[in-house]
Amino acid sequence: YTENGTLQQSFSLQEWLYKLAEVPVGEVYLNSIDRDGTGQGYQKELIEYIPADFPLPIILAGGAGKYQHFIEGLQNKKVDAVATAHLFNFIGNSLEVSRIALLKEGFNLAKWDMNICESLKGFFSHAEKLSE
């Protein structure tokens, strides 16, 4: 589907992925519009459509609601990265909890000081108040 899920396409997701592999793109952001924002987990069926020999990195998105969803997505060899907005925007200290859990599971993440993140939260909260 395209056009926000309103227009059904005549080709499958797998066919579309093969077409993407032929053009100069760096990665594929594979988002489930059915799961996006639900927090119910990634749509695992989408992963089944990714060819085993697919040459581009896949970023799986749409549906993460807890750090376990990241782990489930990243444990699949066809997935190179995961994404979320819902989890970080609406659920307390999810960024810190998720990063700690993923690092404990042995996933390779950029290392940065969580105190800096906290200070940035304060900065952006202050900036929002100033703009009101």
Question: How should these model regions be labeled?
Answer:
Residues 1-30, 34-35:
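Conserved anion-binding
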Residues 7-14, 40-48:
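Charged helix-capping and loop-helix junction motifs
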Residues 32-33, 62-63, 85-86:
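Short secondary-structure boundary segments
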Residues 34-40, 66, 90:
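Short, small-residue-enriched loops and turns at beta-alpha junctions
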Residues 45-82:
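Catalytic cores of alpha/beta
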Residues 71-113:
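C-terminal helical cap(s) of enzyme catalytic domains, especially alpha/beta-barrels
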Residues 108-109, 117-132:
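C-terminal extensions of enzymes
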